[in-house]
Amino acid sequence: YKRQILITVTSILSGCNSTSDEEIISSQDFKENYEVSSYGTEEKINTLSDVELTSSEKEYSDLENAKFFLENNSNKEYHYSKAYFEIEAEQSETWYQLTQLYDPSKDNEDDAVINSTERLSLPFDISSVYGELPSGHYRIIVSISYFESPKDWDYDTYYLACEFTLK
């Protein structure tokens, strides 16, 4: 009987120590829990001089107010996903790829077009895809593609990043 009580108490106590997938990410955990970003090393970012990803502010108190824009000042049209984006966190001058709670493009991989000289608002729901983020320095990354010959699927992909701080 004592053994059953001990096992029950141990189970209850260990359950109190378990973590949830949606818990707040701790900034101290970046190096231990996340991969170092391939953007900027294997994958080049912000290589287009006339297409950029910008934000309405450089600092946000919460992610609900974060607004990002895709600006095409070129004479070309580019394709992008309305749903897919990545968030990375910087710690000790190293960028880490944060883990998505789910792939936002899984249910809706709409291919969208940004025309020449167009500026579009990108309504990304960062909290839904990444959960609550601690204060820190981040960047959002999107990919765009230029189709040289759409019928042949001849295209080039470019990665755009915009840094921001979460207070």
Each model region followed by its residue ranges:
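C-terminal motif of bacterial Sec signal peptides marking the signal peptidase cleavage site
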Residues: I12-G15
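Primarily secretory-pathway and cell-envelope proteins
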Residues: S20-Y102, S143-K167
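Conserved small/polar residues in nucleotide/adenosyl-binding loops
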Residues: Y1-Q4
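Short, solvent-exposed, Trp/other aromatic-anchored flexible loops in extracytoplasmic proteins
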Residues: L101-S149
